[in-house]
Amino acid sequence: MREFRGYLSLQRGLSPHTVAAYTDDVKKLLDYLLDEHVQLRDVTYEMLENFAAALYDLGIAVASRKRVLCGIKTFFRFLRTSGFIEHDPARLLQTPHLGRTLPDVLSVEEIDMLIGAIDPSTAEAERNHAIIETLYGCGLRVSELINLEITRVSFDDEYIIVNGKGNKERMVPVSRVALDNIAAYLHGSRGMVPEKPGAANILFLNRRGNRLSRQMVFIMIKRLAEAAGIRKRISPHTLRHSFA
C-alpha cells in the first residue's frame, strides 16, 4: 500500500486528500477479500463484480460506489504496470452511471425458472431453494441472509428477525412458501452437515458447516440464472428488488 500511495502522490500528482480517499477505498476491497479468504494475486474479474454488487447491497450511494470502483481500477492498473501481478482483473470492470437507472427485476415466471434450474440431486438443492424463496419473499440484503439465525425464524407468526444496517434489528414478514422451504431444509440436508463452532445457530451453512459468504450466494444465483437461460444481470439484490 505504501508503494501505491507513493505512485498516487508522486507520479499522478494527487492531493493528500485524494490519496487518502483512494487508499481508504482500496482497503474496503482488501477487507472484503480477507473475509472471503482470497489472496490479492488470486482475484478475478468475477470476484470484483461480486464486490461491486456487495457495495450495492450495503446501500452505498451510486457516487460513492463509482469512486470506490475507480480507485480499485487504478490500484490494479498500478499493480499490473509495477509487475506485482501478471493480469489486471479490473480492466473490464464497469463503474455505475450517475444518472438514474432502474435495477433489473425478475418476473414471477423468471423466479420459477431460477428455482427450476436447481438440480434436486445435489446436497445443496434444499438450501438453495430456501435461499431464493427467502431473498425473494422477504426482500433481504445478502448480508442479512447469511447471518440469519435459526432461532430468529418464527414459523407460527410468519416473521424473521434480522440484523440490518447499523446492526439494528428489524422484524420482517416472511411468506409461507419461504417458511415451508426453510422447514424442509432444516429437517433435511441442514441436519447432515457438521456444525462448526460459532455457526450452530446460523440457518444457511456450506457443506463444511460454516456460514455462507456473500460470494458463495452471488455465484450460486449467477450459475442458476445461466442454467435457466436468464440473460439479465442477476445477483442477490436482483431478488431483493423483485420482492413485492
Residue map of PLM features:
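Conserved catalytic core of the tyrosine transesterase superfamily
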Residues: 1-244
